[in-house]
Every structure is written in C-alpha cells, then in structure tokens.
Amino acid sequence: MSQLLTSRQAEELHKGIIAYLTSVNLHHSSAALREELGDSIRVDDTTLKKYEGLLEKKWTSVVRLQKKIMDLEARCASLQSELDTATPTSLNRKNQDPVSWLPRAPARHDLESHRSPVSCLAFHPIFSSLASGSDDTTIKIWDWELGELERTIKGHTRAVLDVDYGGPRGGTLLASCSSDLTIKLWDPADEYKNIRTLPGHDHSVSAVRFIPSGAAGSPMSGNLLVSASRDLTLRIWDVTTGYCVKSMQGHGDWIRDVTPSPDGRFLFSGGDDRVARLWDISSGDTKSTFLGHEHYIECVAFAPPTSYPHFAALAGLKKPPPASSSAEFVATGSRDKTIRLWDTRGNCIKTLVGHDNWVRSLVFHPGGKYLLSVSDDKTLRCWDLTQECKCVRTIVAHGHFISSLRWAPPLVKDAGANEGANGTEAASNGAKEDATKMSIRCVLATGSVDLKVRVFAA
C-alpha cells in the first residue's frame, strides 16, 4: 500500500488520534496505540493539549468543503443548463422583457433563520415584504429587496402549513394556517398583531387563500377567505366577523391545496384522493372533476387570462376564450412526478414529464407564456407553453426538497384595493388587462427543507 502521508503528517495524525482518544476517556485505546507506535512518537501533557480538538476541526472542515463543492457543482450545472438554452436575446439583460423574464441562478438572496423546514411563502401585494412559514411554528417577515429579516411572528403551536396576503379593500392582512387546526389573521399595519383566530376545522389546515373581490356578486368584497383541510372540507370565512359562512365537501381524503379563480367565482382544489375539483363558490357545488393522476395531488393553479392563447393552441381551439372569462384552464402537480394541464371541463390537455420526484408547487408566469414548478428533486423548472410545454430552464435551486414557490403578484392600478395576492393571479379587475398593462414584478421565491428561502429577481 502506497504511503499517502509524509512522515511529519503521519506523526501529527497519530498525535491527533491519541489526543482525541484521551479527551473522550478511551485511555486503554490511547495506551494501546502508544505502545504500537513505540519510540517513534513522544506524547506528553503539552502535546495532548496542543493536539486536542485537531481531529474534530479537520473533520468539520472537510464536511464544509464537501458541501461547498456540492453547491458549486450544482451551480455550474445550473449555469450550463442556462447556456445550453440561451439565445442572443436572453443574454442581453438590459433589454429584458418582463413578459419573457425567467429566474436564473444564483439567487439574489439566501434568507436563513428558520430552524425547521420552510413550508410556505407569500408576497405582500404592494410592498417588498415576503412571509415564510415553517415547521418550527413561526412565520418570518423578510424584506426581499434587502434580503433582511424584519420580524418573527409567533402564535401557532404546531407547523405553519400556508400563508397568504389579501383582505378587505384598503386593508391588507396576512392569513396563516397550521397543523394546530387553526387559521390566524395578522395585521401588517399594526406590527403583525394577531387580530383574529378562526377555529373550526377538525384536522390540520393545509392551505389558505384570500378570495379576490366581489366573489359571486357578494357585497363582502375582499372579506372572504378559503381554507382546505385534512378533515376533507373546504371552508369559506368572513374575515371581518371570523364566522365560517360555508363548508364544502366532496373530496374523499386530505385536501392538500386550494386556490380561487382571478374573479373569485370559482375554487380549484386537489388532494390525496388523486382527484382535483372545480367548485362554484356561490352554490358550493362541484362543477367539474379532474381524473388522471396516479398519486396524491400536491398543488393546483388557475391559468391567468394572459395564458389563454397558448392554452388554446395546445388544446387545438380555433380561437382562445375571451380574457374576461373567469376560469378556463388549470394545472395540477402530483406525487406521480407529473404536471397536468386541463380545461375546466375536466379534459387533460397536456401532461408534463421531467421532474424526478414529487411536484410540490406550481405558479404561472404573470405574462402567461410559462409555467414554473418546484419538486422534491431540488429543481425549479420553467415550461414554455408556446413550445408544446418544453422545459426550457432547470435550476438546481436548493440542496434539499423544495416545498414552496411563489411569484410576487403584478402591481395593477388602484393597488391599494384588494388583489389576488396569492402570487399566481392579478386582481379581478387586473385579470382583464393585457400583460403589458400590468407592472409585472420579476421576483419569485422558493422555500425548502434545507431551512432556506431563496429570492430570484431580475
């Protein structure tokens, strides 16, 4: 066997081993090693003190270097992927069109403070605030432009499973839900004071979303909130009173996700029964069911009206539905590693294959051309609806499972009013506007089991 160490390095290693064995009270082992080495090495109390902790330091430094190498390799792979798909236009950042902007590595900010996996994210509809929820029971508020932690919110007693900004006209609130069976409302204008707790669900509350203004002609513009739970129900709440105004049943197992349509007339949900459902909010009835996934449905999304022309081409329609239509196309992501695109009658238009593990979250680009997804395979993928849903960019975004993905909602006129603040659609009045008339914010965030939130921005 070839000698890898010089005689001096071998001597230092032996002294380090003896010092370590002595420090952990393995005196017999230490004495045996000294006897084996004989006169080739001399160890006294001064030597033991000098070499104490040496092995631990070298071990931890090796682990740190290995992690750094893995991060650099992942970043190189991501950059190579971008180069492979780059065009002269995409390389010119100065002339970037927000409608075509896609995230690229590295992230602008790595936000670290959570002590357990990050489970959910939400952008403030106007300001540069980003909320993150975690299994550590806390919600953290970050300034995503500066990359700084603003505050930590405590109140839930178990894992926080979802967060969302929205609320009554002129008064944005933050909603959160948890495995502790409750929904909590927080007031950003009053230092995120907990203004209301909504009990009622009989099991973990897995998703919460504000319903955009004017749902089904309701006079309670912006006052409505929908929640999904492991108790197999969807519940609609009036946030001004705290009362549950409607409970909807139909799923046969845990409801993992729910999202409202841009005009607030419909809900789309999915869960462990492998069925997605489209609901009419005003009647509480299921309008359509979506069958085809072979495992639990983890995430659902409504396609924005800006994407209708691309969906129409995929579906073989002669002309797209009008942009004023409330809910024409949807997407689902599953543990079967696929994403499915549907019309709202329940017909599967396209199945997107590429992820190597559970698909955990979906978001449509506000410009309508792309669908973005994150997965337990640690990647963020961008799918081009104009190229038969080809995956045009893959970013290794985290070192562990990616649990959440949110896009900062576009700024629209009358931004002080309630907006579809879930990061996947604009306000109901903004949904009718062309993408070029919206102020698209080229900012998105991902959250991971690696305890990090990453912000990607132009």
Swiss-Prot record:
Swiss-Prot/TrEMBL keywords: Cell cycle, Cell division, Coiled coil, Cytoplasm, Cytoskeleton, Microtubule, Mitosis, Repeat, Transport, WD repeat
Coiled coil ranges: 60-87
PROSITE patterns xrefs: WD_REPEATS_1, WD_REPEATS_2, WD_REPEATS_REGION
Residue span, LisH domain: 9-41
Subcellular location: Cytoplasm, Cytoskeleton; Cytoplasm, Cytoskeleton, Spindle pole
Domain of life of the native organism: Eukaryota
Gene Ontology cellular-component annotations: cytoplasm; microtubule; microtubule associated complex; spindle pole; transferase complex
Main location: cytoplasm
Gene3D superfamilies: 1.20.960.30, YVTN repeat-like/Quinoprotein amine dehydrogenase
GO annotation, biological process: cell division; establishment of mitotic spindle orientation; microtubule sliding
A GO MF term: dynein complex binding
Listed InterPro entries: Dynein_regulator_LIS1 (IPR017252), G-protein_beta_WD-40_rep (IPR020472), LIS1_N (IPR037190), PAC1-like_LisH-like_dom (IPR056795), WD40/YVTN_repeat-like_dom_sf (IPR015943), WD40_repeat_CS (IPR019775), WD40_repeat_dom_sf (IPR036322), WD40_rpt (IPR001680)
WD repeats: from-to residues: 113-154, 156-196, 200-247, 250-289, 292-353, 354-393, 397-439, 441-458
Family per record: Belongs to the WD repeat LIS1/nudF family.
Domain notes: Dimerization mediated by the LisH domain may be required to activate dynein.
Subunit structure as annotated in this protein's UniProt entry: Self-associates. Interacts with nudE and dynein.
Function: Positively regulates the activity of the minus-end directed microtubule motor protein dynein. May enhance dynein-mediated microtubule sliding by targeting dynein to the microtubule plus end. Required for nuclear migration during vegetative growth as well as development. Required for retrograde early endosome (EE) transport from the hyphal tip. Required for localization of dynein to the mitotic spindle poles. Recruits additional proteins to the dynein complex at SPBs.
Protein name from the UniProt record: Nuclear distribution protein nudF 1
Organism: Penicillium rubens (strain ATCC 28089 / DSM 1075 / NRRL 1951 / Wisconsin 54-1255)
Name of the gene this protein is made from: nudF-1
